[in-house]
């Protein structure tokens, strides 16, 4: 029972339901292998390579001690280290010995520094749970401030509906200078509405209304007055208050108190839900794939600004981007934006060089033949050569940084001051990133830490400008950023925060008929227990960083808020298991950060989605992410009127074929060439199934009057695309997007899941430049028809479905 309880307390799942609805029991050996990954301090992969034995799982007293720490210890600490509540239902969780009957003093220190001190009678506490610790366990494993107490009660203190007294802010109790707090630079709302005290209240303020409790991360201190009064010789309601405390006489306890909203930020989406005629739409793209005359071998923020102006003219509300995360500077040949080294930082390759102020003094130098020939060669390629692009741009960055140091840092100009402010605001995490970049960068582009700080400063500046331009152009949302589900083991995000990650496992998906061996994405998972022990600091920091300079954030594999499939790095430890996370707390943090950043949240919920999370996401105002290809029922493609309202409908994305490839079947032939379809018979079956789907789609378009009735083989692909896009746009979904590559009629895949070296994933460039695209009549017609389809009659009402 002890080991099973530890597995439960560490979040290691015992079973799950697969994509066919079948109940799957996870073998005990696999579950214990994941537990070993969590508990093992050594690098298990290195142990496997050296054939070293692994540390055995805990047993006896060691096992009991670990169970005690996770199951019993918090009952002895009065106040959770991290507690949260909803803003409209503020309450405090307390753990007290059963024998304690004294009053309490609660001190709330808000983020701006204001304090509210409440004197709470014991009668206001409502018991909601109890726990008995065995005396021998307490003696052997415990660090309780209470002596000889084994029975504890959990209390709920509702902050609304009670009459508390608010002491003068000067009558503060001693503050613990070591109490951990979240470092938040921007001001937050504090508590208000403290009315005058009733007669006879001894000059105390009467706190009549706590409904204005501000959103944020506050600090809460609790003092037990029963003991404090007895120490001063005052009679208390608890006859033996002092006797229940240990010799340390600890009477004050501290924790973080988060107040969260019920839902994520909705922005203009609330008006859409109420029947607003215009429903937002936009385009999605891989930023690196854009072409222009001013880029240096890769799509950049300058190209993004140009695209914003282009699509905004047609009424687009957003541009959805691939993850912009920093990648491994030492391995530019691995360009997947979903395998970053640090999700809190931007990829400097997206910097548009001519827009950097330091570029102007260097124009003559960069106009030299050596530079221009290299730029022209890279711009002419259809596939990105990341090592060459990286070498070229980092050489140019070095020149820019030299100018910055000479023209700004040394004379301490206003631009230099903005740089210093940026570095100070970002704090230690940014400096750690710069240090890691300096150490890992190839010798040819190696620079000091200041260089990498400068690149992040410039990249953040340009991304912010793009969002400002989008809003100025009339876009309702602007940019939609993308947050990858994890980060690479050797990256600075994991290594600098290793105490919150499990370094011996990686994220993926369990085996299924489509991937019989399962999927291993090579990304390091956060450890749910360690994350909680560190008061969710990394998750807060990560979410906040990715909600800057955008109007919405798409969270890749949003099911990870509830559970993730872990693979052990050491293959001797089995075949993996699901690990569960504190989903309610993570969602509350997500909603709080969303409201603060005024950022809509979209959860990528494609694939195996557990029912447990669907309703939670819906209630939290997180938008689902649907794909046209998968939006089907037993009769074929669903009619647009049946699309989920609270969703982003995408015709296609980076993991599925482009519209042209799907219609022509070229994606299936490519899969056969790559041995993803093992036989010609499998290819034939896939092509036959695709033919049936094509007939279903054609009938949908014909029935809506978008396509003339004709033999399917006679349908012109350009006409098909022009009909298909507004068909999806006419649907019930609150948000709708089309890939930029589909608008241009490109057939090439961005990424083919299940391949690595077999196909050049994340390297395909678009066939034409932005200026060429702007002159295409077919593009203009498609954008106009999509925009028209997103404007509905006043009487039209959406159907809200999960």
Describe each PLM feature range.
Residues 1-44, 48-71:
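Long, contiguous interaction/targeting segments characteristic
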Residues 36-41, 52-103, 107-115, 120-170, ...:
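Acidic/aromatic-lined carbohydrate-recognition and catalytic surfaces
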Residues 142-144, 330-460, 486-737, 741-742, ...:
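Alpha-amylase-like alpha-glycosidases and glucanotransferases acting on alpha-linked glucans and related
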Residues 171, 176, 182-183, 202:
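Intrinsic-disorder-associated, low-complexity terminal segments enriched in Asp/Asn/His/Tyr and depleted
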Residues 183-185, 195, 208-211, 233-248:
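Ser/Thr/Pro-rich low-complexity tandem-repeat tracts
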Residues 225-230, 252:
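Short acidic/polar inter-strand loop motif in beta-rich domains
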Residues 745-795:
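Structured C-terminal cap/extension of enzyme domains
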